[in-house]
Regions:
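Beta-strand->loop->alpha-helix junctions that form or flank phosphate-binding loops
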Residues: 27, 51-52, 88-92, 226-243, ...
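ATP-dependent carboxylate-amine ligase catalytic core
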Residues: 48-60, 91-96, 120-194, 201, ...
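Nucleotide phosphate-binding/pyrophosphate-handling subdomain across enzymes
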Residues: 9-19, 128, 258-362
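C-terminal helical cap/extension that packs against the catalytic core
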Residues: 38-42, 351-408, 444-449
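Flexible active-site lid/hinge loop adjacent to a nucleotide/diphosphate
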Residues: 147-232, 242-244, 256-263, 418-426
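N-terminal leader/targeting and accessory segments in enzymes
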Residues: 1-89, 93, 447
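Short internal beta-strands
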Residues: 22-29, 209-213, 340-341, 361-370
Length: 449
């Protein structure tokens, strides 16, 4: 039975029907059954499960496939395990149905950027592959194209997806970084680190683990990894990819110069180094790697330059849904900055964020969303008093514009999820961009201070 009729759940059910499995569909929202895609699954033979108690549902199936949005401690998942039945996720199902070698990239931040770089390098190098996973393309939607050993699978993997892996074994695992995130679901940092490490659990000596040598949380479990370790570092020479005197090397082979890389920020340099490791393991040549690194400018809503309007630079970093990601953006923008923070909280504390803000180029912080009061207390507790609360998102943007001077940057980097006001970070980013495009000046000036 597939539990959760999101994009991943629908793809999982579709793949199971292709395998002639008997498929039941379950979702706690009856509205989920009203979509055309679910109708199509039902026409193909899937059975909707409606208006039944959990005790009535349990006997229907042998394996429960959880969509990523359903936590493993959900009552139905717990009851399923107690009866001795298997609980797996969509990623695990995809692994069981495919023959392709898998490159699996996880980490708190930078996953989408890194898999996108790998994707573009492999495309340039003419290496057959498919991109899927947490990038919005379910793994199981690619099964038909991943039916042979000569087509690689490049997958972004989240901590939610790693909750439900058991046999999953990628040819290359890549862990970019581990900093506090999703603690409202994973409860403790120890558990979150453990979940990230699970991506390596089934790997053997014949497989590869690409690891950040500068991340203490990754180093805490790296000795237990059986796969061949390939390291990356922006700070020191390692057996893998590293930066030295403005040049990027893979072992002793010079790949390109740092100044040629189109992406900005130290965090993106780390993503680039990780992608180089994966690409070199897969046989990509240096010319293909350099071509992509010199042209690829990044993903939408990740320190995205929106425009220079009325003397101000506007940046959309809506994808910064945790404090570490916001800190990366703050470190990247060097000019005087008005920072817009806030959204739905994820169980983080903000002391480290405001300590970083105190020593940065941030002049003022505009707080918005559900996290506003918590963030304001954290700011004051750290001795940063230039905070301006405004619950309404659009009024917060207007306030940031008002507080700005010619030559300033206005940066949306929320450090929180978007679910208090928006469907996702992308919708929040687009709302910011529209508000910026409508801006016609009106910041404070010498006369109205």
């Amino acid at each position: 039975m597939v539990f959760g009729l999101s994009k991943s759940g629908i793809a999982a059910a579709d793949a199971l029907l292709d395998e002639n499995a008997k498929v039941f569909l379950y979702d706690e929202s009856e509205n989920a059954f009203s979509s055309a895609k679910v109708d199509e699954l039902i026409k193909r033979g899937a059975k909707p499960v409606l208006n039944r108690t959990l005790s009535e549902i349990l006997p229907l199936y042998d394996v429960l496939v959880l969509s990523p949005g359903i936590p493993v401690n959900h009552e139905l998942a717990v009851l399923t395990k107690k009866t001795g039945k298997r609980v797996i996720g969509e990623i695990e199902l995809g692994y069981l149905l495919t023959k392709s070698p898998i490159v699996a990239v996880t980490g708190t931040n930078g996953k989408t950027t890194t898999v996108s770089i790998i994707d573009k390098i492999l495309e340039t190098a003419e290496i057959k592959h498919e991109l899927c996973g947490n990038v919005g393309i379910p793994f199981t939607s690619k099964i038909k194209r991943l039916s042979s050993y000569d087509v690689l699978c490049v997958a972004e993997i989240s901590s939610f997806q790693l909750e439900t892996v058991n046999l999953f074994c990628p040819h290359i695992s890549c862990i970019l970084n581990i900093t506090p995130d999703h603690l409202e679901r994973h409860y403790t940092m120890q558990n979150y680190v453990y979940l990230k490490s699970r991506i390596t659990f089934n790997q053997r000596e014949s497989e590869f683990a690409v690891l950040n040598a500068d991340d203490k949380n990754i180093l805490s479990f790296s000795d237990k990894i059986r796969a061949k370790k390939i390291w990356f570092s922006s700070e020191k020479r390692v057996d893998g990819a590293y930066l030295k005197n403005g040049k990027i090397y893979y072992f002793d082979d010079m790949i390109t110069e740092e100044r040629k890389i189109a992406l900005i920020g130290k965090h993106n340099l780390e993503n680039v180094l990780a992608a180089i490791c994966c690409a070199k393991i897969l046989g990509a040549d240096n010319s293909a790697i350099e071509e992509v690194l010199c042209s690829y400018k990044g993903e939408r809503h990740r320190i995205e330059f929106v425009g220079h309007i009325s003397g101000r630079d506007f940046y959309d970093d809506s994808k910064a849904t945790n404090t570490y990601s916001a800190i990366s953006a703050i470190r990247t923008i060097k000019k005087p900055t008005i920072l817009i923070l806030g959204g739905k909280e994820k169980g983080e504390e903000y002391g480290e964020l405001f300590e970083e803000i105190k020593k940065s180029s941030v002049k003022y912080v505009v707080l918005t969303g559900d996290s506003m009061e918590h963030m304001q207390k954290s700011a004051i507790g750290c001795g940063f008093y230039d905070v301006y609360p405004e619950k309404d998102f659009y009024k917060a943007i207007a306030l940031a514009e008002y507080l700005s001077d010619d030559g300033d940057a206005i940066l949306l980097s929320p450090a929180c999820s978007s679910f208090d006001c928006f469907k996702n970070y992308s919708e929040r980013g687009e709302a910011f961009i529209k508000a910026v495009k409508d801006y016609n000046g009106g910041g404070k000036n010498e006369e109205n201070r």
